[in-house]
Structure formats: C-alpha cells, structure tokens
Amino acid sequence: MMNTLNIDFQKTALVIIDLQKGIVPIDQSGQVVPNAKKLVDEFRKHNGFISFVNVAFHDGADALKPQTDEPAQGGSGEMPADWAEFVPEIGVQDGDYTVTKRQWGAFFGTDLDLQLRRRGIDTIVLCGIATNIGVESTAREAFQLGYQQIFITDAMSTFSDEEHEATLRFIFPRIGKSRTTEEFLEQVK
C-alpha cells in the first residue's frame, strides 16, 4: 500500500532532468515529455518551483573522460548546436529557473541546492532522462542532502527496460516514494 502524498507546493520543487533535444530521443515510449508537461502544468497551477536541468559542455575539454570498460552511449565527437536546448514541448518560459550541469547529477557543481534551500524547499519531485544516469545521480545527491523525494516513474526513461527497472526496484524505494504521473496528480488534488 502506498503512503499518501502530502504535498505543500510552497515547499516542493519539480526537478526535470535532461529533457533536451540531444537526449529525449532515448525515450522509446514517447511518454516522458507529455507526462513531464502534465507535472509542469500542475506545478504552475500551484505556483510551485520548477527547475529545468540540462547537461552541456563549453568545449568538450570540460567533460569527464574516464577510462571505462564500456564507452558512453551516444558516441563522441561534436554535438549538434541545439543538442542542449530544452525540447519546446516541455514549456520552458522566460524567467524559469534553469540549471546547466556538467556531470550526471544536477547538484554537483551547480547552485541547485542553494536555490532550493533559499526557497524553503524540502521535497523534490523528480523526472527526466536517463533514469539510471542523470535522474538516479540527482536522486542520490538529493538524498545525501536531506531532501524528501517523489519519483515519477512514467516521466523518466533510459536506454533499456532492464536499466530503468533496476533503478525503480533497487534504488528509488530506499531513498523516496515512486508514483506514476496519474497517481501523483490524483494524490495532490
């Protein structure tokens, strides 16, 4: 049985990870952006804080280049000029708070934690791409920083069902609550 969500939109932020032109094509279901947009609309309705997060690099020299057994998916080389732009369907508006991260997690090397704390936010609703990379890294950082978390499972995706399910089954239950978009929207009415 799921615990009821007691959402105070003045203390809760929606954090959307990497819904940008170069990453959204990973979502084979096609449901991540529409579901995230429903969340954006709900947060806007309640004047809730939304953080749109993307990943970008200045010139490539600032990107990590670890020696690994499995190269990063997506290959290497120069990214298209619009690779880091948010997809227009998500509805980023002038004046919205955006974060550009240089690593997997949205907290490391950014002012996201500072901005959330200054607004009195203690809970984040998290969605985006990729479940087991940018989203999970952000979730782990948020957990270590003491935030309560709600993961919107059908507003996130990754390279394979196996990777997605591993995070949903083994990581998220230890650090927060998981809901679908409709479950979340129903519970905040």
From Swiss-Prot:
One of its GO terms (molecular function) is isochorismatase activity. It is an enzyme of class 3 (hydrolase). Its EC number is 3.-.-.-. SUPFAM superfamilies: Isochorismatase-like hydrolases. It comes from the Bacteria. Belongs to the isochorismatase family. PANTHER family: ISOCHORISMATASE FAMILY PROTEIN YECD (PTHR43540:SF7), PEROXYUREIDOACRYLATE/UREIDOACRYLATE AMIDOHYDROLASE-RELATED (PTHR43540). NCBIfam families: PRK11440.1 (NF008517). This is Uncharacterized isochorismatase family protein YwoC.
